[in-house]
Each structure stands twice: as structure tokens, then as C-alpha cells.
Amino acid sequence: MEHVGMDLGKKESQIANLTEAGELIEKRMRTERDRLVAYFKDRPKAKILIEASTISEWVARLLEELGHVVVVADPNYAPMYAQRSRRVKTDKRDARALAEACRLGAYRPAHRTSDEKEVAFRGAWRGALAATR
């Protein structure tokens, strides 16, 4: 199985892919649904590690729909996998560190909301908002 680290950004994301043969493939792309689908749909199934952020949940769900195993890591525990090689912080280094942490299992998963809980939360939020009008 391949191991992928993704450093997500609102506009652009950096991807580091460690293949089964040990090759490192790096790619920078716009963080857009169609571009992510185009890149990941034909790739071998992979374990993908991304840090929790405002956009991590929709990216994780999209990649899971494509058949990949996605882990959203708790960024509060980033020193576990990212501090060793970080003299200057760059997206490329972060993606590489995430890919290596994915391969080694050196991360702490973040809590993820299920679809049902998300729908229930939105319904309750809308109800509370409507009650204030």
C-alpha cells in the first residue's frame, strides 16, 4: 500500500506519495474537487494522512469515496512526526513528514464527525437560528 502525506491549503495543496517501491512522488495542485479526483482516482489505493483543518473533512470524505484510507491527524501532536526535519517550515517538507508519519504510524488521529452527527448538528443550528427571528 502506498503512503501519502497531504499538506492542505485553501488554494493549493502539496502531496508527497511514498510508493511501495520506496519512490517519492511529489505534486503541488490546486485544492479543488475535480483536480483531487483526477489525481487520486486512478492511483493505487493508499493510506493518506492529512492534518485536521477547516477543509480536511471534505477532502477526507472525497478521498474515501475514491476508495482510499484517510486518517485526519491531530495537529496538536505534530511534533511527533514533523519536528525532526524542520529547519525551515515549507509545505513540501510538511507533506514529506506526513507521508513518513503515515508509513510509520507515528500520528494521533483527530476526532471526526460522522455524516449523521453533521446533519443533526446543522438541523439543530438552523432551528436555533430560526427561533431567534
PLM features per residue range, with description:
Residues 1-133:
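Phosphate- and other anionic-substrate recognition elements at nucleic-acid/protein interfaces
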